[in-house]
Design a protein with these regions (language model features):
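Adenine nucleotide phosphate-binding catalytic loops in nucleotide-utilizing enzymes
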Residues: 1, 179-186, 220-290
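N-terminal leader/targeting and accessory segments in enzymes
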Residues: 1-83, 87, 263, 283-286
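Flexible, glycine-rich phosphate/dinucleotide-binding loops
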Residues: 5, 28, 105, 132, ...
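Short, conserved glycine- and acidic-residue-centered signature motifs
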Residues: 5, 92, 267
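Phosphate-binding loop of NTP-binding sites
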Residues: 11-14, 49-53, 62-222, 238, ...
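Short, solvent-exposed coil/turn linker segments
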Residues: 26, 30, 83, 197, ...
Length: 290
């Protein structure tokens, strides 16, 4: 019953669903108090199989493996297993910017949130970064959602469709969960853009062969890439002569690297990704400079 589980319970209950929270461990007493106060049933130190007889869906917490008996039985009984971001995304029609990658997610999300806040776009920062998407939708909705998403959350999406997806990089960390199957891990990260259509945007690092080899020629969405060089038709941010350059349609935004809020080479890439997304959302150059 981590943060995403409690947030999902809250949101589901507020939308009129019958909800049970089930945890194989002991549930914290504060959480129990909250669940009782809003009339949500729970069970602890056990996942009872009888719930699978009536459940329409299971919202799975990121830490739970697909190989547990409970999950295997749910799959056998054809009960859909979804992640909390999949569930939450059904309850908003505001723009979602989802950010994933092996490294740099939190920095990029925080920077993007700061820019959008300065642009008065009323953003919310949520996901894998402290407050779950469901919790924010239930308690404090905004006008645009900056969402940090992990491969664990992407593994169980069905229709989750961000307006803007950002993929920062793909490297072989966190493979223990995937039996050291890096191809499966990389493919899971790519799911961030699988449901996008021609109105949506996919922003990615164009010097990462693990990403490039997975981008299909039939991609429907608008592609915007970033890297050191302006070397392809969809490059939207690059470095030239110690300047960060971001291209939006025909307009160029330039900023000297030493003037940037975040210093360090990896942060140049994080800033490029956040900058491209900001320009797509109509943020002015003056706000970007702040």
């Amino acid at each position: 019953s981590g943060l995403s589980g409690i947030g999902a319970c809250k949101l589901a209950k507020s939308k009129g669903h019958h909800v049970i929270l089930t945890d194989s461990k002991k549930i914290n007493s504060n959480v129990k108090e909250f669940l009782n106060s809003v009339n949500i049933s729970f069970e602890e130190e056990n996942h009872s199989y009888k719930n699978l007889e009536w459940a329409d869906e299971i919202i799975i917490s990121p830490g739970i493996s697909k190989n547990t008996d409970y999950v295997k039985l749910a799959i056998e009984k054809k009960v859909p297993i979804i992640s909390e971001i999949e569930f939450a995304s059904r309850f908003t029609n505001k723009p979602i910017i989802a950010v994933t990658g092996t490294n740099g997610k939190t920095t990029t999300c925080s920077l993007l949130y700061y820019i959008l806040k300065n642009a008065n776009l009323n953003p919310r920062l949520c996901g894998n970064i402290g407050v779950s998407f469901s919790e924010v939708l239930a308690s404090n909705p905004g006008d645009v959602y900056v969402l940090e998403v992990s491969s664990f959350q992407l593994e169980h999406i069905l229709k989750f469709k961000p307006n803007i997806s950002i993929l920062l990089n793909l490297t072989s960390d966190h493979l223990d969960r995937y039996n050291n199957n890096k191809e499966y891990y990389f493919d899971t990260k790519m799911l961030i853009q699988k449901n996008q259509n021609e109105k949506d945007f996919f922003i990615y690092y164009n010097e990462d062969n693990n990403i490039n080899s997975r981008i299909s020629n039939s991609s429907k969405q608008k592609l915007h890439s970033f890297g050191n060089l302006n070397n392809s038709k969809n490059t939207s941010a690059w470095v030239d002569d110690n300047q960060l350059i971001i291209k939006n349609n025909k307009n160029l935004f330039t900023m000297l690297l030493h003037e940037m809020a975040l210093q360090g080479k990896h942060n140049v890439y994080n800033s490029m990704a956040a900058g491209i997304a900001s320009k797509i959302l109509g943020v002015s150059n003056d706000v970007l400079r702040m």
